[in-house]
Regions:
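P-loop NTPase catalytic phosphate-binding loop
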Residues: 6-22, 27-35, 40-44, 51-55, ...
Length: 339
């Protein structure tokens, strides 16, 4: 019996008046599209979602979404035996789209490669708890930066180099403390001002008019929550980190400087309005609650992700696209940088 037949058999056994009209198996996810009979409510599908998942031989909690334009309810389940989606298997340099800072993030749930140009958005926020794939997403952005010859890396690792320590020889600067982060951001603000002066002299308003005029700069900050906590207690420089970050976020894009912030705790105390307003691209891995999901995505849903790199990208060019973050280790990134 095929997947559609198995699903319909399960629905019948549960006395659910719905028909599976489509079933697709992909590398990491399978989904089943149900068309409800008259009188059948979505709530009933949600009530028996666990039993449906078990019936189609999935051990993971399913995710139920309504797709009104198609008149269906979609049940997504994870493939327990799926292979690791390796970045090196996915990345092909000759497939890289034209752009200022194109990044290959992974694969959508329909099997398509997910490319995003970080330069098309002011900046990027990443959130996710332990085991969600947040750190992997950071390493993927670093992997893309390495493969762009004209991208300079500035990394912030408040955990004393635990996350980014292996990049010591390839990054332009790694800050591992609050004080080092403040120094780095001040230097980058000065570089931003210098670039604006050069652009003015050239009669340009943005690096987009000639992407080759400066090397791009990627600022990648892990666990911004730790820095915000320090920032609220430091005297006499209280708030210095936030002020420098907002200054860069508001002005740096036109100068070819792009910021990626990551946090395990996407609370309103960490991602304040002045910060969120300038970080239009959001990558949500699994978070602990619907409240956290609303902070990062302005909607619930990320709390139901499956972990291990199951993520949602929301930006001006990709509206809530679910995808699997590709995997690459820091060691692989370091080997690539030496090639």
């Amino acid at each position: 019996m095929d997947a559609i037949g198995i699903c319909n058999q399960v629905l019948s056994g549960l006395q659910i008046k719905a028909t599976c009209v489509n079933a697709e198996q992909h590398r990491h996810l399978a989904f089943y599209d149900l068309r409800l009979d008259s009188g059948c409510r979505v709530r009933r599908i949600e009530l028996f979602s666990r039993e449906i998942a078990l019936g189609v031989r999935s051990k993971t909690s399913p995710i139920i979404t309504s797709i009104p334009e198609k008149g269906i309810v979609r049940i997504r389940v994870a493939n327990e035996t799926s292979d690791i989606l390796k970045f090196d298997d996915l990345y092909q340099a000759d497939e890289k789209p034209v752009g200022i800072f194109p990044c290959l993030l992974g694969e959508t749930d329909t099997g398509a490669k997910l490319w995003v140009d970080l330069a098309m958005h002011p900046h990027t926020l990443i959130a996710g708890g332990t085991g969600s794939g947040k750190s992997t997403a950071l390493h993927i952005i670093i992997a893309n930066a390495i493969r762009n010859d004209d991208v300079l890396l500035y990394l912030v690792d408040p955990k004393n180099g635990v996350e980014f320590g292996l990049y010591n020889k390839m990054a332009n600067y790694i800050a591992t403390s609050y004080e080092e982060t403040i120094y780095m951001l001040k230097e980058l603000c000065a570089e931003m001002d210098r670039r604006y002066f050069v652009l003015h002299e050239l009669g340009m308003s943005s690096i987009e008019q000639n992407p080759n005029v400066f090397p791009k700069i990627a600022i990648i900050v892990d666990e911004v929550a730790d820095l915000m906590i320090f920032d609220s207690s430091k005297q006499p420089n209280k708030g210095c980190f936030e002020r420098l970050l907002v200054t860069l976020a508001q002005k740096s894009r036109a100068a070819g400087i792009y910021i990626v912030l990551a946090t395990q705790r996407p609370s309103v105390d960490v991602l304040k309005g002045t910060i969120k307003a300038n970080f239009a691209a959001r990558i949500a891995c699994r978070v602990s609650s619907a409240i956290d999901s609303k902070v990062i995505l302005d909607r619930s849903g990320a709390e139901s992700l499956l972990g291990r790199g199951d993520a949602i990208l929301d930006s001006s060019t990709h509206e809530c696209v679910r995808f699997q973050v590709a995997y690459i280790s820091p060691e692989d990134n370091c080997r690539e940088s030496m090639c």
